[in-house]
Amino acid sequence: MKRKQLSGKRIGIVFGTFAPMHVGHVDLITKAKRANDNVLVIVSGSNTQEDRGTRAGLSLNQRFRYVREVFYDDELVVVDKLDEAGMPAYPEGWVPWVNRVKELIAKNTDDPEKITFYVGEPEYVTELNRYYPQAQVELIERSIINISATEIRDNPMENWRFITKPFRRHFTRKVLVVGSASGGKTTLVKDLARTYNAPCSLEYAREYQEKYNVRDDELDTNDYIHLLTDQYAQTSDIIDKGQHSGLIFADTNSTVTKVYIDYYLKENISQEEFDLLDRLYQVTQAREKWDLIFVILPKSNYVDDGFRDMTMADNQTRDWFTRHLLDLLSPFKDKIVILGENSNSDSFFADNYHNAKKAIKERLHIEI
């Protein structure tokens, strides 16, 4: 739904790169809103590598969307973006920049009587007074919330409480656990999630198969479409909600589903259907961003839970599954940690838990 123009006669203007937006920014915008009728928030920058936000993986478009999301339910705040690509560097860039700001004000307001900029740098006061004398400029004190976007980018976990929820998805550390069936993936994910007080996304296929009472070897093309899309959606939802402390665990992803597709359907469906599933897998996998991937070797006993296909229980098939999984994951080999390599059957589960914690500490610098 399109936002209406800001109709107030007193408009506050707050601009910044917001890479990321933190609660100090929100505090400033809220103060500006309460001192005026409305506030126009301008997310500035570019989608080029000259922009520090873009260099940190937060493009101008992403920042714009996320800041809008922060104020989705505030009718007194409108968010727009200013693309600085092609503008000269400051100080020469002030003239085109101010002209573009004037365009955004005209676009988003209804002939306000008073415009007030809220800035944090004395230089901005001087330049805005020079190039936009019709507006007032107020130099604001730093928020009592002592944090900066630079500090957050340098150490997001330490400063997690300051990051606004939409931006948290960018900084979330995501740990994936994969492997063949009956290897202890789900148990390990649950144990790690409890230990680190983090949410987890469990294997969606199990919920799906129980709901529709369908076994592994009975899943068809339509089922796998659901498994690919819904597993991704379930995990993304946990990440996007931001109701965590910067760490989430996931049991299974699209790559595991792809191995099952290749095992069960490659020779049993039309090439057209197989290509459809492969394209869907490629799109889904490209959207997944993992910081650490645990691959569990098939050293535990294969358990018949009523849904598993017991023709996959032999060591040869389980080894093939693991090799194919590792082959598909090879583009991300720098993220992979193999669990169970040097374990025997007695120490397998204990070793996996210990080595997973060790890798999380060494790779992600996260301790209990």
Residue ranges and their predicted role:
Residues 184:
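Conserved glycine(s) of the Walker
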Residues 152, 264-327, 331-347:
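A glycine- and Lys/Arg-enriched "phosphate-lid" helix/loop adjacent to the NTP-binding pocket
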Residues 226-288:
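Glycine-rich phosphate-binding loop used to anchor ATP phosphates in small-molecule kinases
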Residues 155-175, 331-368:
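Charged phosphate-binding loop/patch that engages nucleotide di/tri-phosphates or the phosphate backbone
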Residues 57-73, 218-246:
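Short, structured active-site "lid" loops
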Residues 190, 194-236:
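Conserved substrate/cofactor phosphate-moiety recognition/catalytic segment
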Residues 181:
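The conserved Walker
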Residues 1-173:
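Nucleotidyltransferase catalytic core that binds NTPs
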